[in-house]
Amino acid sequence: MASVLNVKESKAPERTVVVAGLPVDLFSDQLLAVLVKSHFQDIKNEGGDVEDVIYPTRTKGVAYVIFKEKKVAENVIRQKKHWLARKTRHAELTVSLRVSHFGDKIFSSVNAILDLSVFGKEVTLETLVKDLKKKIPSLSFSPLKPNGRISVEGSFLAVKRLRESLLARACSLLEKDRNFTSEERKWNRQNPQRNLQRSNNSLASVRTLVPETARSGEMLVLDTDVFLYLKHKCGSYESTLKKFHILSQEKVDGEITTICLKSIQVGSQPNNAKHVKELIEEWSHALYLKLRKETFILEGKENREKRMIKRACEQLSSRYLEVLINLYRTHIDIIGSSSDTYLFKKGVMKLIGQKVS
């Protein structure tokens, strides 16, 4: 099965573009690959000869298109708006696609929902969103909701940068709050209850965004699938934490996971947490390039079929020890190498009496 590794092995990253936003629920994987190739071979779309289309990939709705010429890839990216059109019996479907450069450190498109209300009245939220758009222009922001929530979409690295920017801002506000509270207590002791309530509310809202560990340790953000595989299938994660006496505080939030690392042994080396952070980043990057995810949809299926799929996954789990199986109410994710996930999926489909698409 095709994977992002094909791009690296073909030595063609400069001729490759990442295409996100494919309508995965409307067409089969095979048809989508054909539609994508046809779209990017059309000169009206600044396209040209396509060497290969890598789809499906580990990330839902994302394909890699390798052109025969570097110039064509550059032209495709220069034309920022791409519309994938498909005529059906009743209507013509048009879908907006997002294209970007491929790089060794590429993390495909992810979505995240932010709750900016934790900043309270410290900043005007509209101004904050404008600043974020200017700072990270590659991200797409939805309109800000009255409750302070906003959704963002973009590459994993861009979302990671956004999260770190917000955490840094929150830490700064927290420090200002502390300084303000200290000064206020010196001159305003006539209404201590009001003063205490005001400072506590402000501090509490910001603290919900900034984990205690992050203020005194090391923080990193990972792709959730990569993190789960690293934690449950790579013994080096837990053994390294134990070896360097590091406490790991993990928060899974959709497609991204935040990890805060802190030394828990008195007298241990001060750089231990930083060293462990670097090791985890190294491992996660290698895994991101190696891993692939397949998904079995349970939602909408009859209970009998759901049970058959679950039983098949359980039956094959002892044969594929390097495949991680994550069971959810609506679906089952299997994560592993490209060959393992393909063979695992093929085995499940055979056990439940279906053909591999």
From Swiss-Prot:
Stored CDD domains: RRM_RBM43
MF-aspect GO terms: RNA binding
Keyword Membrane: no
Designated name of the protein: RNA-binding protein 43
Keywords on record: RNA-binding
PROSITE patterns: RRM (PS50102)
Ranges where the RRM domain occurs: 15-104
Keyword RNA-binding recorded: yes
